[in-house]
Amino acid sequence: MHAAGRTLTSAFPRPRAPVWLVVPWAMATSAPVAAEQVTLPDVVVSASRNEQRRFDAPAAIDSIPVDPFTATSPLVSLSELTLTSPGIAVRDRQNYSQDLQIAVRGFGSRSTFGVRGVRLFVDGIPATMPDGQGQASTFDLANASRIEVLRGPFAQMYGNASGGVVQVFTPDPPKTGFTGRASTGFGSDGQWQAGVSLAGGNDRLGGTLDAWTYQTDGYRDHSAAKRYQLNAKIVAQPSTATKITGQFNYFNQPLAEDPLGLTRAQADANPRQAIAAATQFNTGKDVEQTQAGVVVEHQLTDLDSLNFRLYGGGRQLTQRLGFSGAAPSSAGGIVDLDRTYGGGALSWTRKTTANGLPLQWTAGLEVNGMRDARHGYVNDNGQQGALRRDETDEAADYGAYAQFNWTVHPAWEIVGGLRASMVRLRIDDHYVTAASPDDSGTSTYRNLSPVLGVVWHAMETLNVYANLGRGFETPTLTEVAYGPNGVGANLGLQASTSRQGEIGVKWESDGQRIDAALFDADSHSEIVPLSNNNGRTVYQNVDGVRRRGLELGWHGAFGPARRLAAGLAYTYLDAYFGDAFVNAQGATVAAGNRLPGTARHSFGAELTYKPWGQWMVGVEAKADSKVYADDLNTQAAPGYFIFNLKTGYTFKAGATQWYVFGRIDNVADRHYIGSVIVNEANGRYYEPAPGRRFFVGLRASM
């Protein structure tokens, strides 16, 4: 696939002057093109927590359509669906042990595992834990109907770690009859996917059930993975005023090998390789998660409605790290975690009038909690050795909020909100020795997050909006685990706070959509590594982190029957440290250094054409500029440009609708870095992306 020794090249020259020359403003970006459909979903709920047109939403928000039947990809990763959504960066690490990297306007870019800085939901149920750590791997994209991406100040209404909000929505069962869908597909590197989905119901009761599996040998050595998912949804409507939705989700990943990162020289020489430590310590993880929840929507009167949710679940994880962790002061090289979590929320919405014009407000209460039984063991060449860590970790998140949308004039709308949050983290250390002192302790964080904005409905086809807000992000349990000088927990670590502003415009007319925005976020007490010793990473706060930029999105459908569709997204992100600080190696990080894990320029485009109704052909393009891998800006992944080809054909045989599809990714077989591990302690920052690869599949629906 790749010639040894090929050099990574940059797709973007370094800009001679900053693009940022104007005051901060922001955007609600265009929804990306759905390759197999020309209509875009027009309803969103993330901005106001109630249904409204995306065009009218007073915030930067995308609604990404998902059609599991006519998608031309296996629907394993969120990165398959966000190509033409500006402002969000989703990097598939080709490492199912470490999950995706998701960043919204630069928030979340520094996470080395899981998702931080971005709040995740599925059908209104949180997929982010109370300490701010989330997992996107459990998303059931093969049964999704749309994905909403909310950016900017209004994301702060969701509380801790809300640099952005990503919500996945699944379809309700049909009101009449029965439907079924089956799919299978295979591709390069041993990829294989299969699934089945059933749905049926009537006006009062219905349900959906889908089961799905995916496995791969992995692009790199020691990167094989297997996943199984089972999801059920029951919708009951005992009256016209009440809707009850029950959900059950099961996720099992018994195999997820971790090839670990590479140095730049290793990535250039052989991007498929895994370092020796990966096989020596059998790095990877297995995880099993079960969750159930219920959402009740009740219309009290014509003006008032209630929404109630309750959920709970468990997660069991065993992870083998790339070192032994045998030192007496180490936390071990094998992590064994048994988690229980749950929560509930209640909100009240009232739609009324003021001076004869619409006024809507929503008030709510939320509580979420988690409890981890966490153990660490010596990694004895892939086998569990002696105990090195024994803790009970707890996190609780409490929130109260109120939001309003007030039309003060037929052309003007004022929007705002206020959220009070409290997050409490507790560590109870049961493994205390002379070399491993007591890490027990409690940290409590409180924050008040206001948001205020205005929308000008300039014309039927043009909206202009501006928002200001303030938010916060607490440390995770992992980040407060170890204190400076090897003594106790890091209870002095503060929550990061941010002030955000945006101004944006939305235009829609005759099958086309343009969205443009400028944004600015100024953060204080940002959380960065202070030291790393024997697997114990200590974190510190730094001030003056700035994220500002421009988002542009366009979508259009043209010609008879809208057979030609196109979309593109561009993001300019200027993210940097405003103040100097000392890093984990004792070196001074200069003021003005770029925030690692962020690309200054990102571009995505898609063009699809249907020569006739049953056949679709399309091309995709993606480019990122250079991404620094460390705070010192001494290591960087060069920019890249790739393009993909895809096609799909629909036909009918009897009562069954069939869809056959195929795609070739990275057609030019470019060698590039798909993601970086920010501030990796051993200098192995780079995770290469696959070269040219294919995937073909067949689906049936009845």
Where do the model's predicted regions map?
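Structural signature of Gram-negative outer-membrane beta-barrels, strongest in the C-terminal barrel
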Residues: 248, 354-368, 391-522
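N-terminal periplasmic accessory domains that precede
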Residues: 78-81, 101-105, 118-121, 135-137, ...
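Conserved C-terminal beta-signal and adjacent last beta-strands/turns
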Residues: 22, 222, 235-238, 249, ...
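Transmembrane beta-barrel wall of Gram-negative outer-membrane proteins
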Residues: 179, 186-215, 220-258, 284-299, ...
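Face-selective signature of the C-terminal outer-membrane beta-barrel domain
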Residues: 241-251, 286-432, 514-515, 563-567, ...
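Membrane-embedded beta-barrel scaffold of Gram-negative outer-membrane proteins
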Residues: 297, 305-321, 457, 463-469, ...
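Gram-negative outer-membrane beta-barrel transporters
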Residues: 348-349, 414, 422-423, 513, ...
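Short acidic/polar hinge/loop motifs at secondary-structure boundaries
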Residues: 109, 117-118, 125-151
